[in-house]
Amino acid sequence: MFEGWNKGWENWGGNQQFDYLEPYADFDLERIAAYAREKGVQLWMHNETGGNIPEYEAVLEAAMRRYAELGVHTLKTGYAGGFKGGYLHHSQYGVQHYQRVVETAAKYRIMLDVHEPIKETGIRRTWPNMMTREGARGMEWNAWSEGNSAEYLTTLPFVRMLSGPMDYTPGIFDIDYSTAKADKGRIEWNGPNAECCIKTTLARQIANWVIIYSPLQMAADLIENYEGHPAFRFFRDFDADCDWSKALQGEIGDYIVVARRAKDRHFLGAGTDEKARTLVQKLDFLEPGVTYTATIYADAPDAGRNPEAYLIGKRAVTARDTIRIEMAERGGQAITFIPAEK
């Protein structure tokens, strides 16, 4: 996914006026789209409106048509800030706009990931291209504020997730921002003394891919923070197209354990609050009679004070087995269960 590709970002924070068809001179949209098709890679387009609805609707049809022509069939929209004219997101004006976007996107076979959305209404049952939405305080808040606590992340599944999928954009590996803080743009954005960081362990960041369900998932960190990282294997093995889910254990604001299945693979995600915790979990959600290779992404013993410390282990398991889930403060654990080769 690319954000900031289109002209108009120089007005951000003021009178937002974006061009949803014209890229900046140094961003060759057609060439990038052609290269993606050649490599079999699907692109995500991004449309930030800044709440300027009349401007967006004036080119909505043309923009969707153009994206489809380029082979782009996934679009993330954004509505940061209030709507122009003083309308609220949940006003009749706002709701009608969101409906118009969903229907227009469906016409061009484009899936939507809506940020700053209205509440889940069940519209995805009628318009299944409405794949996921933000609708709560997401990962991005860790970039400029006190961030999202581990307790918040053990509350979110019991509240926000009741209404449907959420695009939280989990999966950050640069937990203490040691890489990001050295970036000139980051210093200009946050200031030289900012204490922004991720408030969980790395293992919990991986577990959130399972806990916070979205059929469109995004590894949201910088590419260089993933390159050569052993834990990135989880994202390669994960299948977001889950056809079965179950909450296995949990207490609101304290801890949670979730299992999901996609085809013949199962995934488990567990997370705790600011308290270290050990849980015992039966694996009876697995297919009986099948032996799985469980790849476990866990907190290292010192993860409470070194949140990027993690362990990766493997073991053979069946539905008759039980596992211990050991989590550090603000920690978690993620497991992939892949049928063993016969």
Enumerate the language-model features and the residues they cover.
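Aromatic- and carboxylate-enriched substrate-binding clefts and catalytic-loop regions
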Residues: E3-E195
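Conserved, mostly hydrophobic/aromatic
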Residues: L112, I211, L268
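Catalytic cores of secreted or luminal carbohydrate-active enzymes
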Residues: A203-A247
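Beta-strand-rich interaction surfaces with strong enrichment in secreted/lumenal proteins
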Residues: S245-L248, V257-V258, I312-K314, T322-I325
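Carbohydrate-binding surface patches
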Residues: E251-P288, Q333-A334
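Solvent-exposed beta-hairpin/edge-strand motifs
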Residues: L286-A300
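Solvent-exposed beta-strand/loop surfaces of large extracellular or lumenal domains
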Residues: I296-R320
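C-terminal beta-strand-rich structural cap/linker in extracellular carbohydrate-active enzymes
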Residues: K314-K342
